[in-house]
Structures are given as C-alpha cells and as structure tokens.
Amino acid sequence: MIIVTGGAGFIGSNIVKSLNDKGITDILVVDNLKDGTKFVNLVDLNIADYMDKEDFLIQIMAGEEFGDIEAVFHEGACSSTTEWDGKYMMDNNYQYSKELLHYCLERDIPFLYASSAATYGGRTSDFIESREYEKPLNVYGYSKFLFDEYVRQILPEASSQIVGFRYFNVYGPREGHKGSMASVAFHLNTQLNNGETPKLFEGSENFKRDFVYVGDVADVNLWFWENGVSGIFNLGTGRAESFQAVADAALAYHKKSDLEYIPFPEKLKGRYQAFTQADLTNLRAAGYDKPFKTVAEGVTEYMAWLNRDA
C-alpha cells in the first residue's frame, strides 16, 4: 500500500493520478474533507481507502500498523501563506510531520514530503538548499523551514529514504478547491469564461516566479521514490517567468487580447515574493534529467484541461 496525505488536495491528488497511471491503486488517501469541494479531485481516480487526517494521526501516534506500506507521500499541510495562526500552523505542518517521519523511520518506509520555496523568504537570487539562504517571511514558510532543519539533523543516520521537495509556484489540474490560493492561471481562466476582462497586478511583467506544472511535480516525486534518493531538493523549472507570460498564454488559448491592470495591495507589500527561480543543481546531480514544461506549454495544457467539458 502507498499512503498519500493531502491526497484529495492539489499536489496529492496529482500524485495519486500518476500512481494510477502506473497501474497502482492500492492507495490510502488521508485528508480532511470538511471542505466539501475537494472530493472532486478523487472522483476519476482509483484508491483503496480513505481516512480522516485526525484519525490517521491518532493511529500513527498509537503505532498501529497499516499492512505493507511501500511509501508515504506526505503532501498534507496548511499551505495558506496568509494564515497567521502560528499554533495551528506548527501543529498542522511541523508536529504532524515529525510524528509521521518517525513512524516511517521505525519501519524503514520511504518518506517523501512537501517542503516549500517559502523557506527562502524575500530572496531575489540564490535559491539554494542551504541554511544561509533561508529566511521565511511568514509562519507557513517558517513551519516548512523548521521541518527541513529537523530532517537535516536526522538524514545522516537515517536507514530509509527521506526526501523533501521545495515546491515553487505549482499550477495545474485539481487546484480549483483552493479558492483565492489557486494559481493565477486558474483565476484568469475563470475570468475569461465569465466574460470578464482578466486582471493582473500593475507591474506584473516585472514579477517573475518559477512556475512549475503539477504534472512535472508528480513525475519528480515518483522518480525519487523509484530511485531511493534522499535529501532536500528544489522543485521548480529553473526558469523565472513573469505573471504577464502566464496571462499571455491564457489569452492566447482563449483567443483574447484585453487585460486590466489593478493596483498592488498594500497588505501584501513586503510579504510578497517578487522573484523566485529554483536552483536545480542538486536535483540534476541526484540524477533527475527530464525537462520541465515552460509556462507557455504548461498553461496551454492546463487551459485545455480546465475547458475540457466546454
């Protein structure tokens, strides 16, 4: 069996899909379906069982067994960069992850988990997986950073695989439940389908992020599991592209040209990553050599998926 926490969420459900594509269906999805919209991410997928995340944690802490577990993909977390309840964030992202990590270590179960580029904070260069480059801007980034630091202490002595992925700006299918936290591509598509003029912040040609397609993210997760490599790795494309480029790709798909530029919100100033670009040196050195989709390629594929029933 393979366990995917956050398996009804954005990246988790895409990992489930990639496992299904390899013929793997003996999957336990762990999540919190209090948000009644997330289930749609699983409707077209095949899994063996589902468990609520609180019930799962109780069983993990009690040392209960789940049969022969081949791997744990730990994607479950509060990923809102605007959530400022520090206790909730640390319980949900840090303590939970520690419990699950130790459960896996005691049983030699490969543990692959979601870290984040938010660990780098407001940097504009040198996004490198090393302590001197890490300075998160929000409690979400701090919770991810602290768990990475915890893993770094354990890695030298670990007898089983531990690998963390610092996700950059992930976009693509199965993110609709995220609402305001969904990608710019998702929101642009919604606006265009509603007959609205799509909106970007002023200066969007200067805001550049490493936008990585979720299908590529799932591919990297599965490659590392299949190859048993441990460590903490950036997971982006290695290219910074502008929000304007995302809009251009969405407009091209919809055969539109008009854009409206809106003022940048005061509340986000100083807490907003204006530039991200993954340094892929360590990822490539680990042996992962597949190319990543460009914004033009990924957004076009995503638009086709979003509008598949249109």
Curated annotation (Swiss-Prot):
GO biological process: ADP-L-glycero-beta-D-manno-heptose biosynthetic process; carbohydrate metabolic process
Cofactor info, note text: Binds 1 NADP(+) per subunit.
GO MF term (any one): ADP-glyceromanno-heptose 6-epimerase activity
Binding site for substrate: N169, S180, H187, F201, E202, G203, S204, R209, Y272
Binding site for NADP(+): 10-11, 31-32, 38, 53, 75-79, 92, 144, 170, 178
Catalysed reaction equations from the record: ADP-D-glycero-beta-D-manno-heptose = ADP-L-glycero-beta-D-manno-heptose
Quaternary structure annotation from Swiss-Prot or TrEMBL: Homopentamer.
Family per record: Belongs to the NAD(P)-dependent epimerase/dehydratase family. HldD subfamily.
Protein's name according to its UniProt entry: ADP-L-glycero-D-manno-heptose-6-epimerase
